[in-house]
Amino acid sequence: MKKFINNVDDFLKESLNGFGKAHSDIIKVNFEPNFISRKTKTKDGKVSLISGGGSGHEPMHGGFVGHGMLDAACPGFVFSAPTPDQMQAAAENVDSGAGVLFIVKNYSGDIMNFQMGAEMYSGKNDSIITNDDVAVEDSTFTTGRRGVAATVLVEKIVGSLAENGGSLEECKKLGEKVNKNSGTMGVAFTSCTVPAAGKPTFDIGNDEMEFGVGIHGEPGRKREKIQPSKTIVNNMLEAILDDLKPQKNEKTLLFVNGMGGTPLTELYLVYDNACEILKSKGIEITRSLVGNYCTSLEMQGASITLLKCDEEILKNWDAPVHTAAMRWGMSVSYTHL
């Protein structure tokens, strides 16, 4: 195992410390229990959005705390769900009187612990469950489809609505619409190593790829030989299109996400291939996102997410955002403490 580590037991704390120092103009990190919140308290009467999950997927979720997205994020240990007391403490810290909306990826541990945290919290709250992965219906960590990269899109789009006065009910309704109209497929060329384990999550040959891999290294649809990028991308899109069934000329957002170990040069190549394929099918790409947003430590691979867009979705996607990992449409001054 080759990683920047001092002591495995201190890995998460040191990482969170560094994150807090690097982005002290936007966020603050709270310990015991661990959660990340906005530096400036949410304005009164705004719905507060809280997400979280196991660490190792950065910048999801802590990198999306800030104006136009999340109010707080709860990081668990690497690939492990956060504990209910984290969600309770985060909610108590950021609730501004309009209620709390928890955004939860569909993994058994996450759902159980977020549900317990919501029950422990005495304030008004509700939840969205994301399950955009079209690869498999059931997996090692889930009953039903896994929640993966489209969670980022939910957090951005719902975050805008919440920032602009949407009610708890309206925010949940929009989040469910985004989730329902999203589909994701991932491919891995390599495994990844959880620091506490010290060895790869799974074994894979140098000439093999896992088609439909999960963000914790869960098995996908099949293991096969690596093929040319256009073939891989076409197969990924076929799976997504079979699920979403977009209409010809329907507006979409195309999101190419890196798993952590794949360079941007390759991600843009994937995006180019995807654009050509979707154009040939008469599908309009009106918005795009390319980069490492929902990762799996150092895994080499990528996922493709397609989101069918209406005017409400596009309006909230385009709205200003300022977080550690996603920012546009705002002029800000920086003050590091």
Regions found by a protein language model. Name each.
Residues 2-42, 52-56, 60-64:
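N-terminal, Lys/Arg-enriched amphipathic/low-complexity engagement segments
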Residues 57, 64-66, 70-96:
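Glycine-rich oxoanion-binding loops at beta->alpha junctions
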Residues 164-269:
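Mixed-charge interfacial surface used for oligomerization/domain docking
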Residues 259-276, 296-309:
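Short glycine/threonine-rich loop-to-helix capping motif typified by GTGT followed
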Residues 290-322:
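C-terminal edge-of-domain segments
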Residues 335-336:
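Conserved small/polar residues in nucleotide/adenosyl-binding loops
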